[in-house]
Amino acid sequence: MTTLRLLISDSYDPWFNLAVEECIFRQMPATQRVLFLWRNADTVVIGRAQNPWKECNTRRMEEDNVRLARRSSGGGAVFHDLGNTCFTFMAGKPEYDKTISTAIVLKALNSLGVNAEASGRNDLVVKTREGDRKVSGSAYRETKDRGFHHGTLLLNADLSRLANYLNPDKKKLQAKGITSVRGRVANLVELMPGITHEQICDAIREAFFEHYSERVEAEIISPDKTPDLPNFAETFARQSSWEWNFGQAPAFSHLLDERFTWGGVELHFDVERGHITRTQVFTDSLNPAPLEALAARLQGCVYRAETLKQECDALVVDFPEQETELRELSHWIAQAVR
């Protein structure tokens, strides 16, 4: 019986691909070695312990229809588009060893004429006249009896967009989440013009087979029909949920301040698990009552722009004479927390 399994995803949906990865990892026999090859369309993928409001330009992501996906491994935030090739290696313990999977990727790159090397704990770099340039980043996850190593290879990614979505607005935000480290990066196409996703996948697959002296047929995973993986529907629902992608953020505080023609406003939010646990309001407005009422209404609310806007708009019923000010405040809050 073969000990290898090779899966290739036809989907560009990050929630689908991460759900497939999670299901395979949970259910694989401890004696199996798995290679999963995939890629995502326009997505910011954050680490398990990260705060999306701190790491990402969430407003620009929303405007550009860029998805947010929280993975189950640690590490920092990365931007994925179809110029990235993603790989996942899985194995049971004690065989699981990220140095083996790293060596397989390095061998695959070398077979394509790219002389890369491991750098630090997570990166693969190539040496250029401008210095070391990162072409791959990785993250890892281990349980009691198994582990996985997943990462991306920058093939022909739009690096300008990477900077757009991973450089957040200068929000007055204090958080305990892990901060992503930005590094000098390079696309493999700069080093090997014409290189394709298919070539990289073929090279990784061949290096994988060669290392284990065994070959298997690839299983194509498609969104056209539900994958034959136990609990996939439930795993996908969780992976695609706001509660997982945003609500799992570490506790943080957010300060918003603005000056309107009718007065200055400071809002202090304490947020835990994506819900507001405390709101403090400071203002020099001649009529602070609507703002005080807003602070009370927001207790326990989900920290989402549309929710905060709805709560603010609802105050017009109680304070009709301040409708203009409340609409202005509502619009500002919705923009500020995105």
UniProtKB/Swiss-Prot annotation:
- Which positions does UniProt annotate for ATP binding? R71, G76, A77, V78, F79, K134
Q: Which residues form a coiled coil?
A: none
Reaction equation(s) it catalyzes? L-lysyl-[lipoyl-carrier protein] + (R)-lipoate + ATP = N(6)-[(R)-lipoyl]-L-lysyl-[lipoyl-carrier protein] + AMP + diphosphate + H(+)
GO cellular component terms? Answer: cytosol
Q: What name has this protein been given in UniProt? A: Lipoate-protein ligase A
Record-annotated residues binding (R)-lipoate? K134
Q: What else is known?
A: In the transfer reaction, the free carboxyl group of lipoic acid is attached via an amide linkage to the epsilon-amino group of a specific lysine residue of lipoyl domains of lipoate-dependent enzymes.
Quaternary structure?
Monomer.
Q: What does this protein do?
A: Catalyzes both the ATP-dependent activation of exogenously supplied lipoate to lipoyl-AMP and the transfer of the activated lipoyl onto the lipoyl domains of lipoate-dependent enzymes.
The family classification in the record reads: Belongs to the LplA family.
